[in-house]
Amino acid sequence: MGNVFANLFKGLFGKKEMRILMVGLDAAGKTTILYKLKLGEIVTTIPTIGFNVETVEYKNISFTVWDVGGQDKIRPLWRHYFQNTQGLIFVVDSNDRERIGEAREELMRMLAEDELRDAVLLIFANKQDLPNAMNAAEITDKLGLHSLRNRNWYIQATCATSGDGLYEGLDWLSNQLKNANR
């Protein structure tokens, strides 16, 4: 009987967990974002070959964030991380106008995958501190986000180095998780 109450208490007041897959083209800022959220500081990064995984605690939610390398040669490996993903963070370098079309192709390819059909989508429009950065509305248009049907999505302007916008993105993810559990 005590176990029933313990489980009920945990369900009401315990930590919720959310599995997040963070992807995007190479040099978009994924690893910088991960460690800014985890450590609160900027770390020196090198191109990710493989993945980094960290748990980020925020507002009584334990986010397990998988940061997977974005170089074109290793993008086919992304699909190995799709299973059980509840939230997808797609990081875009807002200053990289030349590759926004490539980013759109990769995003749409992923969203067509059956294993990600229930995952919510958060776009981090990163590097907003740079003078020629595209704003969130322009990125929304160039990624074709308004054409998405049956998918909860949100775009957040961010700057990984200062941390601007990162926690607002986690707020949106945590609200999606709470709404899904109702």
Curated annotation (Swiss-Prot):
Spans traversing the lipid bilayer: none
Entry keyword annotation includes GTP-binding: yes
Keywords: Cytoplasm, ER-Golgi transport, Golgi apparatus, GTP-binding, Hydrolase, Lipoprotein, Membrane, Myristate, Nucleotide-binding, Protein transport, Transport
Inactivation phenotype: Conditional RNAi-mediated knockdown in the eye results in aberrant compound eye morphogenesis. Maternal RNAi-mediated knockdown results in abnormal aggregation of Golgi apparatus and disrupted cleavage furrow ingression in early embryos.
Main location: Golgi
UniProt activity-regulation remark: Alternates between an inactive GDP-bound form and an active GTP-bound form. Activated by a guanine nucleotide-exchange factor (GEF) and inactivated by GTPase-activating protein (GAP).
InterPro entries: Arf1-5-like (IPR045872), P-loop_NTPase (IPR027417), Small_GTP-bd (IPR005225), Small_GTPase_ARF (IPR024156), Small_GTPase_ARF/SAR (IPR006689)
Substitution effect: residue 52 to A: No defect in Golgi apparatus and cleavage furrow ingression in early embryos
Subcellular location: Golgi apparatus membrane; Cytoplasm, Cytosol
SUPFAM superfamilies in the record: P-loop containing nucleoside triphosphate hydrolases
Protein's UniProt keywords contain Ribosomal protein: no
Lipidation (N-myristoyl glycine): 2
Record membrane topology: Lipid-anchor
Region Important for the stable binding to the membranes: start-end pairs: 3-16
Binding site for GTP: 24-32, 126-129, 160
GO CC annotations on file: apical part of cell; cleavage furrow; cytoplasm; cytosol; endosome; Golgi apparatus; Golgi membrane; Golgi stack
GO MF term list: GTP binding; GTPase activity
One Gene Ontology biological process: vesicle-mediated transport
Listed PROSITE patterns: ARF
Listed Gene3D superfamilies: P-loop containing nucleotide triphosphate hydrolases
Enzyme category, top tier: hydrolase
Function recorded in the entry: Small GTPase involved in protein trafficking between different compartments. Modulates vesicle budding and uncoating within the Golgi complex. In its GTP-bound form, triggers the recruitment of coatomer proteins to the Golgi membrane. The hydrolysis of ARF1-bound GTP, which is mediated by ARFGAPs proteins, is required for dissociation of coat proteins from Golgi membranes and vesicles. Has a role in eye development. Required for cleavage furrow ingression in embryonic cells.
Family to which this protein belongs: Belongs to the small GTPase superfamily. Arf family.
Protein name: ADP-ribosylation factor 1
Source species of the chain: Drosophila melanogaster (Fruit fly)
